[in-house]
């Protein structure tokens, strides 16, 4: 029972999800605050559930406090019951009221189901009920059945004194609901008219009673006045006894006639209202009979729809049987095709066995070549290490040789400069000797010194000598002139010493400039650098060619390895396919006939395939193996020779210094990268 109720709840929840609401309404927790239900009611009947009423529902109660949720749910349920009693004229005395406390605290599904039943009743009875009914009809049949059951429970709980109409809904469709709703609307309109007529009748009856009371009061007053002898009027004048023909009698008579006329009019109106009420009762009976007829017709429609559903189910079963028949036919055709494929696979399996044997031989041969390749790789690595050590030794020796050559050249230049200085000194000594012989030492010394002195100092000395002569001629015997002469002589000696040191410095600089000319050195270095750059470009080109050759060889080796692995995988795939084909052949032979399967031995096929496997296969000739090994050896030797030549050409660059060689890019990295590949 609980499972069925939960099923009804989930059906109502699926219908509620189809509504376009702003608040979340996908599960029980989102419905427990009452916000989504209030928005749905506002959407169904905005004239009853107004926006001001919706504003009273606190949307901030979600997941905060269950008491706030309970207050929201109380407002919603009370408004729902008011709507049913005032607008729809439903008295839900037998319907169990939803427990809002259990919904707010525990999200009870049973209580939520009752709340959703009430919401469903509002949707079906509102002004836009046609659209909501069509939305319900678009749902699945199981959901429609549960929704119809919920509506039946809601309709059955109405008060019997109200003459409620139980809506009979079919399990397969909800179209009969529309006729019932139309009749219910007509019944509600007639009830409204009866209610209005009854109201008018009550008003007229009240008016009649009031008139009767007024008449009785007037009659009592009339009787009292008749029995009294004297009556004083309002103005204090005695009216005298009530007698025929008196003024008072005539006044009372006139009032009595007026009251009688009013009474007659009220009685006529009452009779008219009675006739109208009888007419409306007859119309109501006719409408009730029409409703009964329509209910019968709806029952017939439901039975016819049930029959149609049964026929549909039988038609669906017939279609399923036809589809199964077609599938069995296709399976029979596939079985015949499989027989043919088994024969083809047997032929292919024999070919695959032969190919498998060939692939195994190829794998063995490739394994041998793989071992040889590994040996060659190790030898190449050893040779590269030896080459590196020898090249490092060669570089050191070249560096030492260059240093020694530089020292030798420096010593040779120093020797040449010393020899030249010796010759120059000899010549000067000879000249000095000749000068001493020819003239005085002072004159020769001054001549030699003047020749060696620069022109500025010579002019200064001549000027000083001229001044000295003038002073000697003008003041020959004075002490001041003697002092001046001594000062001039001291200055001359100082200048001569400075001149001598300058001459020595000039000679040393001239010898140094002759021995080390920077322009010549720059030109020679430029030529050497150009030659070295050309050699470097040539060697780099050779190195790139050797690297490309080695990379192509490495690619070939990797390609052969990949081919070998691919062949091995193909052999394994062929073997597995062969096993599958053998199993299929056994199954097909067994499926032909069990008697034939017992007569035919399945092991015969295995023996046949074993014999086919043991047959000798053509082997690779010895000449082909020798050609492959010789080609591989030649390829390895060529690659090694190219690498060594490029390395030696780079290391033995003519005219390069140690620093210039260190600036060049080492080609060893590319070779090591080639080896690692």
From Swiss-Prot:
Keywords: Coiled coil, Cytoplasm, Cytoskeleton, Developmental protein, Endocytosis, Endosome, Microtubule, Synapse
Residue ranges constituting the Calponin-homology (CH) domain according to the UniProt record: 6-123
InterPro entries to which the protein is assigned, alphabetical: CH_dom, CH_dom_sf, Hook_C, HOOK_N
SUPFAM superfamilies (alphabetical): Hook domain
GO BP terms: cytoplasmic microtubule organization; cytoskeleton-dependent intracellular transport; determination of adult lifespan; endocytosis
Record's GO cellular component terms: centrosome; endosome; microtubule; synapse
A GO MF term: microtubule binding
Coiled coil regions in record: 135-436, 478-588
Pfam families on file: HOOK, HOOK_N
Keyword Cytoplasm among UniProt keywords: yes
Compartments (UniProt record): Cytoplasm, Cytoskeleton; Endosome; Synapse
PANTHER family reported in the protein's UniProt record: HOOK PROTEINS, PROTEIN HOOK
Subunit structure of this chain's protein: Homodimer. Interacts with microtubules via its N-terminus.
Stated family: Belongs to the hook family.
Stated role: Involved in endocytic trafficking by stabilizing organelles of the endocytic pathway. Probably acts as a cytoskeletal linker protein required to tether endosome vesicles to the cytoskeleton. Involved in modulation of endocytosis at stages required for down-regulation of membrane proteins that control synapse size. Not involved in synaptic vesicle recycling. Required in R7 cells for boss endocytosis into multivesicular bodies (MVBs). Has a role in regulating adult longevity.
Stated name of the protein: Protein hook
Organism: Drosophila pseudoobscura pseudoobscura (Fruit fly)
């Amino acid at each position: 029972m609980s499972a069925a109720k939960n099923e009804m709840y989930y059906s109502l929840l699926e219908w509620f999800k189809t509504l376009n609401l702003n608040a979340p309404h996908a599960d029980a927790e989102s419905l427990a605050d009452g916000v989504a239900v209030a928005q749905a009611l506002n959407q169904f009947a905005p004239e009853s559930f107004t926006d001001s009423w919706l504003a009273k529902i606190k949307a901030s109660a979600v997941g905060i406090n269950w008491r706030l949720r309970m207050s929201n749910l109380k407002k919603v349920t009370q408004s729902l019951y008011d709507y049913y009693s005032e607008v729809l004229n439903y008295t839900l005395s037998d319907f169990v009221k939803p427990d809002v406390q259990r919904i707010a605290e525990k999200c009870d599904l049973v209580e939520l189901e009752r709340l959703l039943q009430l919401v469903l009743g509002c949707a079906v009875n509102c002004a836009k009920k046609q659209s909501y009914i069509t939305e319900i009809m678009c749902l699945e049949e199981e959901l429609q059945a549960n929704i119809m059951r919920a509506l039946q429970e809601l309709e059955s709980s109405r008060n019997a004194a109200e003459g409620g109409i139980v809506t009979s809904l079919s399990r397969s469709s909800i179209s009969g609901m529309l006729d019932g709703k139309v009749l219910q609307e007509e019944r509600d309109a007639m009830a409204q008219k009866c209610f209005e007529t009854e109201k008018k009748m009550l008003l007229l009856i009240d008016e009649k009673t009031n008139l009767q009371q007024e008449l009785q009061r007037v009659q009592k007053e009339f009787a009292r006045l008749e029995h009294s002898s004297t009556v004083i009027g309002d103005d204090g004048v005695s009216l005298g006894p009530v007698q025929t023909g008196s003024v008072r009698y005539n006044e009372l008579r006139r009032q009595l006639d007026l009251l009688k006329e009013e009474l007659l009019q009220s009685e006529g109106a009452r009779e008219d209202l009675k006739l109208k009420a009888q007419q409306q009762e007859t119309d109501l009976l006719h409408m009730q009979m029409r409703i009964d007829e329509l209910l019968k017709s709806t029952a017939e429609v439901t039975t016819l729809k049930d029959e149609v559903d049964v026929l549909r189910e039988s038609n669906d079963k017939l279609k399923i049987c036809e589809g199964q028949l077609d599938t069995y036919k296709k399976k029979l055709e596939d079985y015949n095709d499989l027989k043919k494929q088994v024969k083809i696979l047997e032929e292919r399996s024999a070919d695959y066995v032969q190919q498998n044997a060939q692939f195994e031989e190829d794998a063995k041969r490739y394994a041998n070549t793989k071992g040889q390749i590994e040996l060659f790789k190790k030898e190449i690595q050893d040779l590269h290490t030896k080459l590196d050590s020898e090249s490092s030794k060669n570089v050191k020796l070249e560096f030492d040789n260059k240093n020694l050559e530089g020292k030798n050249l420096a010593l040779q230049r120093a020797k040449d400069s010393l020899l030249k200085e010796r010759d120059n000194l000899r010549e000067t000594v000879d000249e000095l000797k000749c000068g001493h012989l020819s003239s005085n030492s002072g004159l020769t010394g001054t001549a030699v010194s003047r020749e060696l002195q620069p022109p500025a100092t010579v002019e200064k000395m001549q000027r000083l000598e001229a001044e000295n002569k003038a002073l000697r001629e003008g003041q020959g015997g004075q002490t001041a002139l003697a002092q001046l002469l001594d000062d001039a002589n001291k200055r001359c000696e100082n200048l001569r010493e400075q001149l001598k040191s300058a001459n020595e410095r000039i000679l040393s600089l001239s010898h140094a400039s002759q021995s080390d000319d920077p322009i010549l050195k720059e030109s020679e270095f430029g030529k050497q650098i150009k030659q070295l750059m050309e050699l470097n470009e040539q060697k780099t080109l050779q190195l790139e060619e050797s690297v490309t050759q080695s990379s192509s060889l490495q690619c070939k080796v990797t390609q052969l390895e990949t081919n070998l692995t691919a062949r091995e995988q193909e052999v394994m795939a062929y073997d597995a396919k062969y096993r599958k084909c053998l199993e299929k052949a056994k199954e097909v032979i067994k499926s032909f006939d069990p008697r034939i399967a017992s007569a035919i031995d399945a092991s015969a096929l295995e023996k046949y395939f074993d014999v086919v496997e043991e047959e000798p296969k053509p082997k690779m000739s010895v000449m082909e193996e020798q050609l492959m090994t010789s080609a591989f050896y030649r390829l390895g030797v060529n690659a090694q020779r190219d690498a060594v030549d490029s390395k030696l050409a780079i290391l033995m660059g003519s005219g390069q210094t140690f620093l210039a060689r260190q600036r060049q890019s080492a080609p060893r990295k590319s070779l090591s990268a080639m080896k690692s590949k």
